A protein has these predicted regions:
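Surface-exposed, low-complexity/disordered segments
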Residues: 41-45, 56, 60, 81, ...
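Extended, solvent-exposed regions of the mature portions of secreted/cell-surface glycoproteins
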Residues: 91-92, 113, 136, 315-328, ...
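Contiguous segments within soluble domain cores/interaction surfaces
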Residues: 24-48, 53, 59-60, 64-105, ...
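A short tyrosine-centered beta-strand micro-motif
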Residues: 124, 142-146, 265, 351-353, ...
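Bacterial Sec-dependent N-terminal signal peptides
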Residues: 1-33, 125
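Local beta-strand/beta-hairpin segments that build beta-sheet-rich folds
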Residues: 96-100, 159, 245, 323-327, ...
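Glycine-centered loop-to-beta-strand initiation motif
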Residues: 69, 99-120, 125-132, 244-263, ...
Length: 862
């Protein structure tokens, strides 16, 4: 390790201009070691970035979210990230994960879909009639997150995350001017996504350049002023000590100020004609200040001043997306030092300039942006064969990709065309260029990020520098990279489908080494099998690399100890436990207020004024329009609890699983333990009736006494359907072959037709997937790559049928469209039955890491 560190230290000195004449002095050597540690850290733990291009800006329940993912090495922005698996999750307004995808990354690309229809397709088993049991999703703000397992080492702030409004499905087909959210009480846990704290109106935050003010030293102070929704207040005037502050944009600005105890150190803002004063941060008696001039095209100039501190050698580093781009030490002239940096010698993007002592203490830090060598020069121009299209008419579209010199580029793009008659998206406005170069390295709301790339004139440069000034969050922690803070790798890079875990002794919770672990993974139909064996290391760890497969497979792990001692083998089977390290799921985060703030929608077509054909409500059962009601049993709403996924995660953490009653008690306060024995459960003070389901090959025998159903081990349960309507049993028709002879549902139907009863259907796991009765083994499942659906586009070349309607909002989607040698990519599709305005946008990353995006609006001229 010391040898590698020395090599990187020398490389850092050569690359970044360390020409200090006293290189052998210990202070300089120590400072250089911090810089070398940063370089080594980035080599051993490189970060990755993800950007998702979506087909639309907002959605309605029942629709599908289509996305194309770009995975890059964060430092170079090249599509060469070492991770080969991307996880994409859909989270409800409450923070529950309702859909997830595990996608194979090839050359930095993958794509998929997330359905906003719940998981109702799972619940057809066991029903004899055509009832449709729905685990209904609720409208609200949904979050899509994407990350690799390696990204989890750096915290969820590094994930890709976007929040979408998901509206109720329109009550009249195609009436997307209806944008409604419905709040519905469910049985779900009270542990929902927390709300962000409401801000004062207005809220002003001050950010001294470099991190702190020092008495008697002039410093630039950035400020940001926002309303109670976290959005910038643009119409603002400000002054300090009677002097007007200029260059305020999107509520952000800056000014020069020399703190002095004699001054009032306040800034006065005028908002909506009202004046209000805000006190500046208190100045330190001693310390360092950092001031940079980033207005020049070629060089960055940095001025450092100190006051009241003991003279010592100070190091300076610049980190760009984890890359050590610069290292040197300051040369003091009295209490001032100066740095000149050639911006052509550092990467383009967000830079982190850090000043630090030989003990690794940060004395000043500042973000700035470098436009030089920007990799975003790829242009995507989108054109169509006509300026406007009739309903159902064929559309011929061409996307042309060129470099800044106009040279055609062969590459893959993702292309979306949508109905633009209703503009109902949120505040998100990033594209692939602005996200990977700017927004992903910052935190908080950035209004119109494209503005900062429009020009390099003084106005744009000052606005961008003010944006850099008001950032408190750091994607790249200097202390961690420099080695002054501990860093533990908890999630390893995945270069394919792997199974890794640990074997430990349950009685004394210690790892077991030299244990032979045999693995057998097989497809649900048993046609495909993979088998391997390994021996655990000193930490009890094991790892298997599998060939690619899709969807869930059964997995059985067998333990043995080939040392010839029969007693050891028996003890192993009784005491050993197997944990599997699965990629941990995302945690619930607090939405920023700007993420759920909706601008006023724009509707470009006349809306209907006739009464809406509302959905029918039958004894709290939702019956969709157009469905013939027979015996009021077409649709039943339920809550689905996916026990298998949760119990496997608990097992892998070494937690006790418990039984069905204990599980439900933790899910919601409305579930109650009637006798405080976890034998009888109630919901809304009414006893719950459990219905165990019976299937061939399941873990249960011929009979399960109903009175004991709540005591069923979680390990035996696949999922639970809970019907929160007390009369659901009147409409529930279960197949007799899937019911036990003494099922309480039979008695309910025959004798208690008007009695309130809450039903919980318990679905068993397959016997091959249950561990509890197999000593020295672990039966579970292993998740393969997710199967990806193709986007459907109708063909109207023979004209639509009479009376046919088509209200598709996404008209065309291709996540992987290739351009030819002339840089052209052609797309052919058909308009829907009404669209007047189309919006098209495209994204790309070339193999050389060049970024490109393009968009256009196709509409008739007025």
């Amino acid at each position: 390790m010391k040898k590698n560190l020395l090599t990187l230290t020398i490389a850092a000195t050569i690359l970044f201009g360390g020409t200090h004449t006293q290189a052998q002095e210990s202070p300089y050597t120590r400072l250089r070691e911090f810089a070398a540690h940063i370089a080594a850290f980035n080599k051993n733990c490189p970060q990755e970035k993800v950007f998702l291009h979506f087909d639309n800006k907002a959605y309605y329940l029942g629709e599908t979210i289509w996305f194309s993912a770009y995975v890059v090495d964060a430092g170079t922005l090249l599509p060469i990230a070492k991770s080969k698996i991307l996880y994409v999750e859909l989270l409800t307004p409450d923070g529950d994960i309702v859909a997830s995808k595990k996608l194979k990354i090839v050359a930095g690309r993958c794509y998929g879909n997330l359905d906003l229809i719940g998981r109702s397709e799972t619940f057809s088993e066991g029903f004899s009639n055509k009832i449709n049991v729905i685990n209904a999703l609720r409208s609200g703000f949904y979050e899509v997150r994407a990350y690799t397992r390696e990204m989890q080492n750096f915290g969820e702030g590094c994930y890709f995350s976007r929040v979408f409004p998901v509206y109720d499905a329109p009550e009249t087909d195609g009436d997307y001017a209806q944008m409604q959210f419905t709040t519905t009480n469910t049985t779900r846990s009270t542990e929902v996504r927390k709300k962000s704290k409401k801000q004062n109106n207005p809220t002003v935050e001050f950010y001294p350049e470099g991190g702190a003010l020092v008495e008697g030293i002039q410093s630039r102070i950035g400020f940001r002023i926002t309303d109670n929704k976290g959005l910038p207040i643009s119409d603002t005037k400000a002054q300090i000590n009677g002097k007007q502050i200029t260059d305020i944009r999107e509520g952000m600005g800056s000014f020069l100020h020399t703190p002095n105890e004699a001054d009032n150190n306040k800034v006065t803002f005028t908002i909506d004609g009202k004046e209000e004063s805000f006190k500046l941060p208190k100045a330190e008696k001693k310390g360092y200040t950092l001031s940079i001039d980033n207005m020049q095209e070629q060089n960055l100039e940095a001025e450092i001043a100190r006051s009241g501190v003991h003279p010592e050698t100070i190091g300076a580093t610049i980190i760009c997306r984890g890359i050590l781009a610069y290292f040197d030490t300051l040369r003091w002239e009295g209490d001032k030092a100066h740095i000149t940096i050639d911006k052509n010698k550092i990467p383009a993007g967000v830079q982190q300039l850090t000043l630090f002592t030989e003990k690794g203490k940060i004395v000043a830090e500042r973000l700035f942006f470098s436009h030089n060598n920007l990799p975003n020069g790829i242009n995507i121009s989108i054109s169509t064969d006509k300026p406007a299209y009739k309903p159902f008419e064929k559309v011929n579209l061409n996307a042309k990709v060129t470099d800044p010199a106009g040279t055609p580029i062969e590459t893959y793009i993702s292309l979306a065309v949508r109905d633009g008659d209703v503009e109902n998206g949120g505040n998100y406005s990033d594209n692939i260029c602005t996200d990977l170069l700017l927004s992903s390295d910052l935190k908080g709301y950035i209004s119109n990020p494209e503005y900062y790339f429009e020009s390099n004139d003084r106005e744009h440069l000052r606005a961008l520098d003010n944006l850099m000034l008001v950032q408190g969050w750091r994607r790249y922690g200097w202390e961690t990279m420099a080695g002054t803070k501990p860093f533990k790798v908890t999630n390893y890079l995945e270069d394919g489908i792997t199974i890794d875990g640990e074997v430990y002794a349950l009685s004394y919770n210690k790892p077991l080494k030299d244990i032979k672990v045999r693995m057998r993974a097989f497809s649900p139909d048993g046609k495909y099998v993979q088998s391997q064996s390994v021996t655990t290391n000193e930490k009890g760890e094991f790892n298997f690399k599998l060939e690619d497969f899709y969807d869930d497979w059964h997995l059985i792990l067998f333990l043995s100890k080939d040392d010839g001692e029969d007693g050891n083998e028996e003890r192993l089977k009784k005491d050993a436990r197997i944990k599997i390290n699965r990629a941990p799921m995302s945690q619930k985060r607090i939405y920023a207020q700007w993420e759920t703030n909706m601008p006023n929608p724009i509707v470009h077509y006349p809306t209907s004024t006739k009464p809406l054909d509302k959905a029918t409500q039958v004894q709290d059962f939702l019956v969709l329009p157009g469905i013939e009601i027979k015996e009021q049993e077409n649709y039943l709403d339920c809550e689905a609890y996916y026990v298998r996924e949760e119990s496997e995660a608990m097992y892998d953490k070494g937690e006790l699983l418990g039984n069905v009653n204990q599980y439900l008690l933790e899910k919601a306060p409305r579930f109650m333990d009637e006798e405080h024995t976890t034998n009888i459960m109630s919901y809304k003070n009414t006893p719950i009736t459990y219905i165990p389901m019976r299937f061939e090959g399941s873990v249960w025998g011929s009979t399960i006494p109903p009175q004991y159903s709540g005591l069923i081990d979680l390990e035996e349960v696949e999922y639970i359907l809970f019907f929160n309507n007390p009369f659901a049993y009147q409409h529930l028709r279960l197949s007799h072959k899937n019911m036990y002879p003494d099922s309480p549902l039979i008695d309910l139907i025959n004798h208690s037709a008007s009695e309130k009863k809450y039903l919980a259907l318990i679905y068993p796991r397959k016997r091959a997937a249950v561990t509890y009765d197999m000593k020295g083994q672990r039966a579970t499942y292993i998740e393969g790559y997710s199967t990806v659906r193709e986007f459907f586009s109708p063909d109207y070349k023979n004209a639509p049928l009479p009376g046919e309607t088509d209200y598709r909002r996404t008209l065309y989607w291709n996540p992987l469209l290739r351009t030819d040698a002339e840089g052209n990519a052609k797309a052919t599709f058909y308009n829907n039955g009404r669209c007047h305005i189309m919006e098209a946008d495209a994204s790309t990353i070339t193999p050389k890491g060049k970024l490109g995006s393009g968009k256009t609006k196709i509409s008739p001229k007025k």
